[in-house]
């Protein structure tokens, strides 16, 4: 530090200090005449800077005798201690050691921000590689191979579970339906007429018709499905119409209709009550609520594809299968279909595009037919068979779909796995720290002296990095450092640049005065 102060005290001097590189400074006598050379000695405790080219002082070009030059620019001193430039004065940028450059403050800030982001990212996302034990630990502890085997098994298990989850997600995109039997019960009761002698008023004879139903229990259902809430009877239908005998109830009162709306509340059955004391023939029309919607095919297309009622995607898929089986695709223009005699009769065209098929199918698809049940409402008190049962096929959501959804949405197991993974990462990190401590102590035990020297060198490098010190202060404080080949060229370039700068300033000043 004393040597550093000595250089800084010499650098800011004027003309005498600037020529210190020649080995001596010329003292100016009265009138500006050069006096005898005066040797500048170092301050107490300071080292003396000696130039590699000793010689007498020489006048600077472009300066009058006796004049003094004021210092310009940064102070001159040893590299790394004087001024702010990141390179030595007069030394080309390419000749500077890249490792000795001081990074700009903006670059340092960017590097620090990037490091913080990387640490946060690594803290949030643990990699599979963090669970792997280093090879050195596996050599020291042979029993750790069992852990590596478990890790490989876990990797395979994770891959299998992930593949299964993807399969389930793809399956949920398609409608998963299963066919069940819906049993419909149609019953009626008769209330005979009653007379009231007291007030002369009585009740007329009437009957009541009930339409209800339920799903038949399937022996293959699980306990989960058995305890599940039962669907209401009306949820299976889009509309229900009961048509009574028009001759008995007239054209305005012979129809009883129910249609589903957005605000419809589901019910377990329907009942109709009308006056009457004779048997009534009625027709029950039930329109199933298909989800997704299904359509009835044109009879010609139904015979060709072997489908009576189906969803639109299934119909298009069946038609494409027919085209592919009979090789009806145009070999030259693949977007066209060459219709055979059956397709020509149905679509009334010899050639059509694939993109036209959905539009052409629209005219061939009709609403599905309703379920028609004919029933006789009996008012005979001796008739014991007043309840009729009918079984129809309905499509309900597969119970497996609910289990699939619950499997995908369940997070309890994921949280438990994440907790165990964190424990594994902490354990592996502790093992790595213990391994580092073991290697540290083992190296010290083998060669204490060499280990201490290497450790001090490493700590010195870390200290320089932490304190942002550029260069090697231990070398730069010695005079031999400045007897290297670069010093002479650096000094000459520095003086030349200062002279050129001063000359330009003088020329500008003289030019202003002349004008």
UniProtKB/Swiss-Prot annotation:
Query: What effect on the protein does mutating residue 495 to L have, as reported in its record?
Result: In CSS11; does not affect the interaction with SMARCC1 and SMARCA4
Residue numbers carrying Asymmetric dimethylarginine: 68, 88
GO molecular-function terms, A-Z: chromatin binding; molecular adaptor activity; signaling receptor binding; transcription coactivator activity; transcription coregulator activity
Q: Which residues carry this modification: Phosphothreonine?
A: 203
In this UniProt entry, the residues modified to N6-acetyllysine are 223
Classification via PROSITE patterns: SWIB_MDM2
What SMART domains would the database entry show?
SWIB (SM00151)
User: Quick one: where's region Interaction with ESR1, NR1H4, NR3C1, PGR and SMARCA4?
Assistant: 43-167
Necessary for GR/NR3C1-mediated remodeling and transcription from chromatin: annotated segments: 180-515
Q: Which InterPro entries match?
A: SMARCD1_SWIB_dom, SWIB_domain, SWIB_MDM2_dom_sf, SWIB_MDM2_domain
Q: Which residues form a coiled coil?
A: 412-440
Instruction: Return the GO cellular component terms, semicolon-separated.
Output: brahma complex; chromatin; GBAF complex; intracellular membrane-bounded organelle; kinetochore; nBAF complex; npBAF complex; nuclear matrix
Localization, UniProt: Nucleus
Write out the ranges of the annotated region (Disordered): 1-103
Looking at the record's lineage, which domain of life comes first?
A: Eukaryota
Instruction: Tell me where in this chain the SWIB/MDM2 domain is found.
Output: 290-367
Q: Which UniProt keywords apply?
A: Acetylation, Chromatin regulator, Coiled coil, Disease variant, Intellectual disability, Isopeptide bond, Methylation, Neurogenesis, Nucleus, Phosphoprotein, Ubl conjugation
To which protein family does this belong?
A: Belongs to the SMARCD family.
Summarize the protein's role. Involved in transcriptional activation and repression of select genes by chromatin remodeling (alteration of DNA-nucleosome topology). Component of SWI/SNF chromatin remodeling complexes that carry out key enzymatic activities, changing chromatin structure by altering DNA-histone contacts within a nucleosome in an ATP-dependent manner. Belongs to the neural progenitors-specific chromatin remodeling complex (npBAF complex) and the neuron-specific chromatin remodeling complex (nBAF complex).
Q: How does it assemble?
A: Component of the multiprotein chromatin-remodeling complexes SWI/SNF: SWI/SNF-A (BAF), SWI/SNF-B (PBAF) and related complexes. The canonical complex contains a catalytic subunit (either SMARCA4/BRG1/BAF190A or SMARCA2/BRM/BAF190B), and at least SMARCE1, ACTL6A/BAF53, SMARCC1/BAF155, SMARCC2/BAF170, and SMARCB1/SNF5/BAF47. Other subunits specific to each of the complexes may also be present permitting several possible combinations developmentally and tissue specific.
Record-given protein name: SWI/SNF-related matrix-associated actin-dependent regulator of chromatin subfamily D member 1
**UniProt organism field:** Homo sapiens
Q: What is the lineage of its organism?
A: Eukaryota, Metazoa, Chordata, Craniata, Vertebrata
